[in-house]
Amino acid sequence: MEDPFEEADQPATEPGMVMDSVEAGDTTPPTKRKSKFSGVGKIFKPWKWRKKKSSDKFKETSEVLERKISMRKPREELVKRGVLLEDPEQGGEDPGKPSHAMLKNGHTTPIGNARSSSPVQVEEEPVRLASLRKAIPEEDLKKRLGSTGSQPNSEAESVPENVPKPPLLPPKRPLSSSHEASEGQAKDATSSGGTARFIISTSITTAPAATTAATSLAKTVNLSVTPSPAPRTLPAAPASTNTTATPSLTHMVPAKQPPIPPPKPAHRNSNPVIAELSQAINSGTLLSKPSPPLPPKRGIPSTSVPTLESAAAITTKTPSDEREKSTCSMGSELLPMISPRSPSPPLPTHIPPEPPRTPPFPAKTFQVVPEIQFPPSLDLHQEIPQQEDQKKEVPKRILDQNFGEPHIPSRLPPLPLHIRIQQALTSPLPVTPTLEGSHRAHSLLFENSDSFSEDSSTLGRTRSLPITIEMLKVPDDEEEEEQICPSTFSEETTPTSVIPKLPQCLREEEEKESDSDSEGPIQYRDEEDEDESYQSALANKVKRKDTLAMKLNHRPSEPELNLNSWPCKSKEEWNEIRHQIGNTLIRRLSQRPTPEELEQRNILQPKNEADRQAEKREIKRRLTRKLSQRPTVAELLARKILRFNEYVEVTDAQDYDRRADKPWTKLTPADKAAIRKELNEFKSSEMEVHEESKHFTRYHRP
């Protein structure tokens, strides 16, 4: 008896094992055990099995949720929350081993000594992420990192990561694919990008330590950038005049300043560099959100419509950048990611989301020289076809890369944004007032450069290049606005960006992803709940209309209403109906037998009035005679027909109680016997009967 239960209680054993052990224990013979506990097994095993099944399901679901969350959460944020422990070895790794640093537990972790200071990362991060990331991006990163080996470890590491993706496109997890695409495009655009590289390299000279790395980085940046509108790559060069014009350069600068630990990209970006870029941008824009800002990723090469890239870049611009908006013509497009040359400290793309760290970057590093303007036609036209080809892929990549952004859904503009920006720069137009921060979808793009912003928006109107601005209210937005470091951004519009509109399904995915970046404990929400929480005002309006339509659909149809109400008919119709009813009634009445038939069948007696009166008179006479012949009471008593006494017994009301519980209302057995006897005597004497039939006259048994 003891063994089977003990075995059944052991959680480690599988249900099948439990059965086997129950049946074949060491102590008793298997056959005996089987017969003995077959009933017990029926009672307990289903419960045990059910319990184990539920736990298996729970494990599976928890694994899936963990996988999703780990894919969504930037490592730096997880470290902040204490979910992950920071790897102490990371800081010590030399640039030669970028691949290891990039993929810790499948997460691309930025390489750099500065990062070691960031919160501890847990090795428990699901290894599944590693499978998600593709090996190709890692190899690319290694190559790029290797090129920067001359720089100090921190610089070299930070720069390579930044380099692969131009600052405009902080890539998200899809980066692996987007990265490959960007490389392929980079080859195509290398010719066009050559000018940008040259400019970047020249400007880089200001930073002696990072010059070699910067040049190589600039090249890589151009390669990755070329897929995206050329203008950005070109602006990057101007920006590099202060040694960090290109995104890669900006990252290099942070390396010099150890106090700012670069955020650890826990993003799905296989490219740590891209992850870093995105995180650095986020750190400036959204302190709460480590995930990269909407800035389009270069990783989305062609996929990232120029609008994405420029918008993303814009989000990172600081107020000082906006002052210089007018000065940057071409540079402004690339600069959006690179903080435009601004005396005030631009948002270091390399910097982790924490606001305090952003200030350390010298404003100088991000100054961009606007004078260098590249003909808009140069790379733009070459890259436009590629981008349009890849627009198909945009939705997915955008989702992945923008996953951290709370305010995402927007439309894919018919014309690439970089072209629009180019047009806006070329055609000076009055500056339109920027929308308030409440307009979530209004991009910083429109606020980064005055002429730039107005031009782009007005061009959208005049040339029917729709930049649709949607107000997307996400729960995290208000928190982010409150937490945004004042030094990094003076305007509320920080979290806003213009993004190509995505298909509805992609939008929902993005919203789910952005939800993962919210501060606080990770809450597992149902998909329905998430959708509801992110419904915009427009969605609510549509929903209201839908519900109204549903209610209207539920209204009874006209034929149904006619069934329950008298339809309005003309007089002729009424007469026709009346005639039909009359015909049916006549037909029914015609089926009744006639009086003649009834008389023949003796059912109806033929009578006239005289006969009836005579009948009545006869009845009356007969009755009166009977009454006159009625015997009196005395006669009846004398003839013993009436046997009761001629007195009436009267009782007081209080004495007469019909309630059954009173003793005087109950007949005693003697009373009952007397009643039976009297009745029997009356019945027997009521009528003369033969002796043999006498027993039939008994009314009650005595």
Curated annotation (Swiss-Prot):
Pfam families: RPEL. Keywords: Actin-binding, Cell projection, Cytoplasm, Developmental protein, Neurogenesis, Phosphoprotein, Repeat. Residues 233-250, 486-497 have a biased composition (Low complexity). Residues 1-38, 82-194, 222-363, 473-536, 592-615 are annotated as: Disordered. The keyword Repeat applies. PROSITE patterns: RPEL. Residues 508-518 have a biased composition (Acidic residues). GO terms for molecular function: actin binding; protein phosphatase 1 binding; protein phosphatase activator activity. Belongs to the phosphatase and actin regulator family. Binds PPP1CA and actin. This is Phosphatase and actin regulator 4. It comes from Pongo abelii.
